Amino acid sequence: MPKNLTPILEAIEPVIIGHDCELVDLEYVKEKSQDYLRIYVDKQPNGIDIETIAELSELVGEKLDSMQPDPLPDPYILELSSPGLERPIKKEQDWEKAKGQYIHVGLYQKLEGEKVFEGHLLDLDDQEIKLEIKIKTRRKQLTIPRKQIASARFAIEF
């Protein structure tokens, strides 16, 4: 499994941007005995359609096949898809889009006895985020240091 996906990212991002789309995430994983290169793309304002995904999949596949040296010498399956409604929050622009939205945050270590929180993102800066969470019927503001955040994604509020 490649440790550094940066050359792949740098090669395929212009292809994706050239179709007015956004590269949301990129991962290389092994499931059972098969390797997968998963690329998540989106298009604003209304999301990406299946025709664009199919076209990008072909173009990205061609770009990957032409790279020398081959960054993925072992056989793998290329999957290109939408990140869905619960898309990850990774880049700074994702965090900005998430302001006021309902999000899911997973932490490296417990904070106030919990490692997972869901709530509305009220504010953020370089050091921390402010989340409004609901505990039973009470609303509470929680400040979470960004260095403690293991993962974050948009969430659906029920």
Curated annotation (Swiss-Prot):
The Gene Ontology biological process annotation of the record reads: ribosomal small subunit assembly; translation
Nucleotidyltransferase found in the keyword field? no
Q: Which InterPro entries match?
A: Ribosome_maturation_RimP, RimP_C, RimP_C_sf, RimP_N, RimP_N_sf
Q: Which GO terms describe its cellular component?
A: cytosol
For this UniProt record, the keywords arranged alphabetically read as follows:
Cytoplasm, Ribosome biogenesis
| Gene3D superfamilies hit by this protein | Ribosome maturation factor RimP, C-terminal domain, RimP-like superfamily, N-terminal
Q: Where in the cell is it found?
A: Cytoplasm
What the protein does? Required for maturation of 30S ribosomal subunits.
PANTHER family in the cross-refs: RIBOSOME MATURATION FACTOR RIMP (PTHR33867:SF1)
Q: Which family does it belong to?
A: Belongs to the RimP family.
The UniProt entry, under NCBIfam families, shows:
PRK00092.1-2
Protein name as catalogued:
Ribosome maturation factor RimP
